[in-house]
């Protein structure tokens, strides 16, 4: 899989736009907005669905394991801003796994750790353009 796309449930429309742009450019993506979850996890895979859940619940464990497996198998990582704590934790995991990391969307404030991103793109089209240029440079 090419990309793991992370973001906030509150920003899921923007996440879907990034997934659409990447898939339109021929990439394969994993994202919570399109993931197929099993029955245990499905109840939690909705806006606010996991907010009051206990971490030990089987559905929460299933969600975590599926998302982590997808993150490990992805070649690159995209964070769609603004995003919450969970998506930022996923960013740290991706960086720790030595994935190329990109951000898309408005950065509400300057964060020094955002330097881990190879690029901070303004919108999905900007991300696709940046990736095309970066990929062309790697081929040379």
Predicted stretch roles:
Residues 1-140:
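Conserved catalytic or regulatory cores that recognize and/or transform ribose-phosphate-containing ligands
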């Amino acid at each position: 899989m090419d990309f793991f796309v992370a973001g906030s449930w509150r920003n899921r429309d923007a996440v879907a736009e990034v997934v659409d742009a990447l898939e339109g450019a021929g990439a394969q993506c994993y994202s919570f907005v399109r993931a197929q979850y099993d029955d245990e996890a499905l109840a939690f895979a909705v806006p606010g669905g996991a907010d009051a859940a206990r971490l030990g619940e089987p559905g929460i464990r299933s969600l975590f394991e599926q998302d982590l497996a997808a993150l490990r198998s992805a070649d690159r990582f995209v964070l769609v801003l603004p995003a919450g704590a969970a998506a930022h934790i996923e960013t740290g995991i991706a960086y720790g796994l030595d994935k190329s990391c990109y951000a898309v969307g408005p950065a509400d404030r300057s964060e020094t750790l955002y330097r881990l991103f190879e690029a901070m793109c303004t919108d999905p089209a900007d991300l696709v353009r940046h990736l095309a240029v970066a990929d062309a440079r790697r081929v040379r």
